[in-house]
Amino acid sequence: MELKIFRDALPAAGTNCTLKAELPLETEILISDYLPPVFKLVKCFVRPVVLQKRLQPGKLQLEGYLRCMVYYQGEDGAGLCQTEQKLPFTKLLDLPEFVFTAWAVQVEGQTEYLNCRTVNPRRIEVRGAYGLVVSVHTQVKTDVITALSDGGVEQKLVTLSGVRRAAVLEKLVTVEGEIRFPTPPAAVLDLSGNASVGDLKLLNGKAVAKGVLVVSCAWRAEGDPVLQSQSVNLNFNQVLDVDGLSEDCRCLCVAEPVGFTLTEGEGEEPSRLTATLMLRLRAWRPYQLQCVADAFSTKFETEQTPQTVQTESLACTLDETMTLTGSGPLPDAGAKILACFASFGPALLAYRENNWDLTSRVTVTAFGENSLSELESYEKVLELALPLGRELPSDAELIPECWLRAEDLRCVCANGTLEVNLSVKAEGAILQRSGNTCVGSIALGEPLTPADQEISLRIYYAQAGEELFAIARRFHVSPAQMLAANDLAEGTTAIDAPQRLLVPGAGG
């Protein structure tokens, strides 16, 4: 007799790997004529901006640029000045060979080292390296057995649930607006911003993201070395074309400013501000699929091979804010803090004190003017440990897809001590992988030995916790017959307490 096997496909968890790579940096930056010449270098920062990611069998290609920003003290009392350069890069990474049907790549990292020196007052040499931490997460279409029939087959079904990665989109968008200064700025030291998506609407194949970008501008007036701050809110409303997106998806969208351009207005006209945002959208579609977890035949011997299927589910989503504080002594008790910045290392997960935390190493850099009127750079390292707020086992396989940003940063000098107060915003999702054992293949063998017709019932002493299906399989009888013969409630799957069971029509 032929056994009928029915199959379907589900998006199983695929390869999950993390690798490190180094982006070398070697450049010369020329100070423009409209900027003061260099008196003293204060600090150099490097930030990667990844514009393209291409995943191929055994290869991952990253394209983007390194944003190199140099802060210096200008000559003749010019105060704090800034210049920057964008250095394009293409990085090809070797990966293990694996099959995938959906994927996402998370690129993080931190500066490994930077050496910055003044060649002459209008030429700066920068050498160093940025360490990338690249995480690749995939799903792969996997066939599973969903039902069996004929051949006297009995089956135990299990429902597998998880999420299918429906969409991964990273898109650069432009946001424009105006900023009005009380007096024309002699120099704009820094443009930075925080963006948040306040409303996200899903349509079939489209997403509408509405939010606000808060831009902060540090600038200096003509003849005044004191830094001033100006901020402006720019609203954005972006319609994104997203293949595979539908209204039943679980979705998140994170906005990150990656560049700014300021065009000075003529006369009394306000200056024109153009910001470039990277919108990162992730979407998952929930699914459920019944699979055959175990099977046997009441008429034939069976030979089966187990199959382990890993599914992915959304353990939780993150939209949390946490405040970090820290302090440390300054070499000059009379230092005056002028500006401060925060950079984040890779976001990791750690199990501590019966709870999972999202962790990251945060470096806060503060610029200060010492008692000799020279500018110095001070650093304070903070440790982020954000509780996920959900009970998960200590051995859970979790994958973070998270982004961290500084919502608010304040640094002050009090009695010779640098005091830091940082508000961190964490956005993203935590995926959880779970292993499930199913029947991968099954075939009928030789017919079973006919039951002894003189034996109509057998007695089996079952122990607490034994599964009814396993007992029925041992004697090659239908679980439904076991239920009926022992007056067990319909739906009973396991024995609660030790008891004697009648086994009807048992074979030899």
Kindly label every feature range from the protein language model.
Residues 2-454:
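Membrane-lipid interaction segments
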Residues 446-484, 489-508:
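Primarily a LysM-type cell-wall glycan-binding module
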